[in-house]
Amino acid sequence: MDSKKTAIIAIAVLAIVISSLGAVSAFELFGMNLFDSSTDFDNKFMSGTFNGEVIQNEIKDNGSIKGWTDSYSDNENNITYNMSCVKDGDFITDVYQLQGLGAPEVRNYNGQAWKIFYSQAVPDNNVTDNKTSGNDTNNTINVYICEADINGTAYTINVMSYENKTECDGTLFCPLYKEYIGPLVESIQFKEAKKAPKMADLLGMSDEEFKFNKDYVDGILNGTIDPSKLQ
């Protein structure tokens, strides 16, 4: 694999896959105060505590990913927490950044650095015209991606909140983050993940193909590769 064009094609295909996955999962939110109840969770790769009454969602895992993803919802406050543990999983957020996702904030909780990304989305099934009335703001989904990289493995919590039930300005100082996301991330206890699936396998790539694409994405992000000069 010696053509940079191959990398661009692979990234373009991956972007479509990522967008599709995001569209499937981006349909829930939360909002509660610190006096509400809390809910403990414990899965194959991490454990911790949510603020509020949260239930586990059923996931139809297939193949090597089975047990390495998890999902929870706070139905009272419209919130979804999607979790995953994948080797080289930071490749996904790197590609997100190529698509325009802003650089992450970095926070240290219990000795572990977390990268915190923020973005927004609008569910297509709820909006027919993005230029319509002032109620449109209620359709905006606030998305926080919290990622901890440990020995080449990404532990990721994707939090989605909609209907503006909890104030959010996209920072780490708004009620949405301070009351719900921050406390959750701070509570996380990691588990050994030597058998976590590899991103290469999930994308249907050989190790060589994945390394080529990852190196290429890394090069664009760190400025050593100029994609505009691709021939």
Feature map (PLM): residue ranges:
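Sequence contexts marking disulfide-bonded cysteines in secreted/extracellular proteins
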Residues: 84-86, 145-147, 167-169, 173-175
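Signature of long, low-cysteine stretches enriched in small and polar/charged residues
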Residues: 61-64, 92-152
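Secretory targeting signatures
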Residues: 1-30
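Secretory pathway targeting signatures of secreted, lumenal, and periplasmic proteins
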Residues: 37-97, 127-137
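Ser/Thr/Pro/Gly-rich low-complexity linker/stalk segments immediately outside membranes or between
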Residues: 27-41
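Surface-exposed amphipathic alpha-helical segments
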Residues: 49, 53-54, 153-231
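Hydrophobic beta-strand residues in large extracellular and virion-surface proteins
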Residues: 41, 46-50, 70-72, 79-85, ...
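Intrinsically disordered, low-complexity polar segments enriched in Ser/Thr/Pro and acidic
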Residues: 30-32, 122-128, 132-137, 206, ...
